[in-house]
Amino acid sequence: MASKPRMPMTPSAPDISRLLQQLSLQMEKDPGLPLAWLEGHRQDPNLMAALKGASADVPVAAVLTCYELILRQDLIAAGHAIEKHRRPDDPLQVNILLDGLFFAACRDFIRASQLLVSVVNRHKGSLFIWQKMLTLCLNAGYYSQGIDWYQKAIALSGWGAAARFNLMELGSALYALDYQFERAIAIRREELALQMQRPPASPAAKSSDFNVAKTWQALTAVVDLLEGHGMRPFPTAGTLLGWWREGAILNNDKDLDVALMPADSLDLARKIMLAQVRYIAAPMSLNSNSYSCFFDRVTQVTVDLLQFWDAGEKLGYGWLLPGKYRAQSRVLHFDRFDLLRDHWQGHEFWRPDDPDHFLTQMYGPWRAPDPHFDSCAGVPNLQAMTEMVQATVYNQLVSCVSRGNYAKAMALIVSLRDHNDDHPVLGRMEIWLRKNLQNQC
């Protein structure tokens, strides 16, 4: 398998011809390379302007134009562009690749998978095409098929450490969503071993994508919708923590957390939300009897909707897995509580009648922010460290190491060890992290 060609740098406008020549050469070796390059550079306005001005007679320019429209989700324009630039001779199967990516964006997963299978069989050494194939399986819920394809991909010789790591990211997700948590954990441990062979990552800059106003809009929208159907949704977890500690939504919260009491129906809430054009079921979320994840198209915010259930003298909360997988669930127990009506920033919400006690059960000493808190396995009221919980902590650990957040990674290792995970890779990773934490300082 050929090594990955070096990517050209972002050009100034006069350099666009030379850039397109380089990308054309790359496309002849691997039609996925120019598309992967575009994904990394499409936020550059100079580049986009230069590509728009490029001649449509240059095949790679037409391909990039089509793919940029797909990435932008301008699917009507993308469909027209793909047909306009379709070439009768297509030895590299670029037309088929674009068609597959287009149908994947349209969520026509059956047609997309048929097309991408054809292309990946023609270009077995293309990391980009394998990634798109495996991502499609994740989005479509084709987990068993995705695992088969992952095994084929990872077995190929010639992948470098970075490429293997990228494939493993997708493979571990496929196994986890197929409830094969032990295998997902094993892959994550392999990823940690690979990370230690790579140069240390610089701490990632804080994302500027978070928008408090849009997140607030998303919260009030989902609460008003469900209340309009007689339910009593209320902020929970990080969203309640922001309300009670900061008086505002936390600026580092990645999603909204909304809960229902046992008397309300999560199934009905799902139907109500999905009947709205505004919401879609979030892809790549674990199938659970007590948890659903939605994407708000208007605000671009993710909404986690969870349901409490009766657990004897307590109330259960978390990710309750279906059927034979229930023993692997992530379960938290809360003392029973009632809901009260209260005001937050001029809006009325339901909330637990004793938020202090609720948050203490979930976070321990919650009044002082702890940037390294393990919100998955570090919560005081977690009932058991199941394989699903362990797999989730490993997901977070790999992510923290990748982003250079070594202090949080150390805290996650401590959490795993507190739950009797003494795998050797954790010891090696701890030494590696300590060394690189000193270098960061």
Language-model segments: what does each one mean?
Residues N139, I147, G160-F165, E169, ...:
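Helical scaffold of the NTase/Pol beta-like nucleotidyltransferase catalytic core
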Residues S55-A56, D89-P91, H123-K124, G158, ...:
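Short coil turns that delineate tetratricopeptide repeat
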Residues L69, F103, C137, L174-Y175, ...:
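Residue at a conserved register position within TPR or TPR-like alpha-solenoid repeats
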Residues S208-V223, E227, M273-P352, H357-Q361, ...:
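Conserved catalytic core of two-metal-ion nucleotidyltransferases
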